[in-house]
Amino acid sequence: MAIEKTNRINALFDFYEPLLTPKQMTYIGLYYRDDYSLGEIAENYEVSRQAVYDNIRRTEKILEEYESKLHLYRNFQLQSEELDNLLKYVEENYAYDKELLTRINRLESLEE
C-alpha cells in the first residue's frame, strides 16, 4: 500500500468520518489508522476477508466522492499553504509587529 494513498485516505477520513456508517468507520479506521490486515479485521468481526476488502474499497470511493463534491480536504490544504506563506512573509518583513504575529498564530491554532 503506497504511503501517499494511506495518507490521503486518512486525511479524507478525518474530514468525512461523520458521514460514514459505523461499519465503514470501523473497517477503514482499523485498516488505515491502526494498520490491521484484511484477515485480522475479518477474524475480529467474523466475516470473510473479501467482505472486508469490498467494504474498504467501497468506502474509499465514497470518501473520494465526498471530496470531489465538497473539497474540504483540498481547501484545507490550500488554506494551510497560504497561512504558511503569510507567516513566512510577515516574519521576513514585519518581525517587529508582535500583534500581527500573534494574530497569525491564532489563525494557525484554529487549524488544529
Curated annotation (Swiss-Prot):
InterPro entries: RNA_pol_sigma_r3/r4-like, UPF0122, UPF0122_fam_protein, WH-like_DNA-bd_sf
Signal peptide annotation: none
Domain of life: Bacteria
Alphabetized Pfam families for the sequence: UPF0122 (PF04297)
Family per record: Belongs to the UPF0122 family.
General function of this protein: Might take part in the signal recognition particle (SRP) pathway. This is inferred from the conservation of its genetic proximity to ftsY/ffh. May be a regulatory protein.
The name this protein goes by in its record: UPF0122 protein LSL_0628
Originating organism: Ligilactobacillus salivarius (strain UCC118)
Organism classification: Bacteria, Bacillati, Bacillota, Bacilli, Lactobacillales
